[in-house]
Amino acid sequence: MFSQSACVQVHIKTNELHTAVVEKVILAMISSCRTDNNQALHKLLHVAVCEENYNV
C-alpha cells in the first residue's frame, strides 16, 4: 500500500481543511490503481497532486 504522502503530513498543521481534501484526492487516485505493477504510477500521481496543490 502506498504510504501517506509527505506533503500532506508537512502541510496538515498549516492548512488542515485543504490538506484533508488533497489527501482524499490522492487516496482516491491511488485506490483506482492499487497493484504492485503500478508503484511508479502511484508515485507519479502523488507528485502530480502535491505539485498541483503546493507548488513544491
UniProtKB/Swiss-Prot annotation:
Keywords annotated in UniProt: Differentiation, mRNA processing, mRNA splicing, Sexual differentiation
Gene Ontology process terms (BP): cell differentiation; male sex determination; male sex differentiation; mRNA processing; regulation of mRNA splicing, via spliceosome; RNA splicing
Disruption phenotype: Male-specific lethality in embryos.
Lineage, highest ranks first: Eukaryota, Metazoa, Ecdysozoa, Arthropoda, Hexapoda
Entry keyword annotation includes Hydrolase: no
Function recorded in the entry: Male determiner protein (M-factor) that controls male somatic sexual differentiation. Acts as a dominant factor that regulates the mRNA splicing of doublesex (dsx) transcripts and promotes expression of male splice forms of dsx.
Membrane as UniProt keyword: no
Domain of life the protein comes from: Eukaryota
Protein name per UniProt: Male determiner protein Yob
